[in-house]
Amino acid sequence: KYWLLFYLARSPCRDLCQKNLHLMRQIHIALGKNSAQEKYALVQVAHSKDRIKNEHRQQDPHLLNYFISDKEFHKFFSVSRFKQSAEGYYLVDPLGRIILYYPPHARGEAIYQDLSHLLAHLTTG
């Protein structure tokens, strides 16, 4: 079981999205030995024709890359406590619960500090 930090964005992944993918990679590296407990992903809301584009995986083999439809996107927000169209970072615990949200312009240091603290101090059974 692992923690998942994912970035939710509309496809295609443009400048801000690219910057935030780089930031997630840097956070993962900065976690050091605790990085084995964390994975990171890009979740893109895409039309089916966009699903074949998977260039991010080639640039970063550790990045998990998922595509969801508009319908899946709307369903996600209908059952979550987050605002519709909330592009940004989401932190999921090992039990599959979304516990934190960070806006797209969040500071990497804040995300790193929260994640580092959780990995160092919390265990789930």
Please name every model-derived segment:
Residues 1-4, 19, 33-36, 114-115, ...:
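Non-globular targeting/processing and membrane-anchoring segments
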Residues 1-24:
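Short active-site neighborhood of thiol/selenol oxidoreductases, capturing the structured segment around
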Residues 7, 40-42, 91:
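Structural beta-sheet core signal
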Residues 21-42:
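Conserved helix-turn-beta segment immediately C-terminal to the redox Cys motif
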Residues 85-86, 91-125:
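Thiol-/selenol-based redox modules, centered on thioredoxin-like
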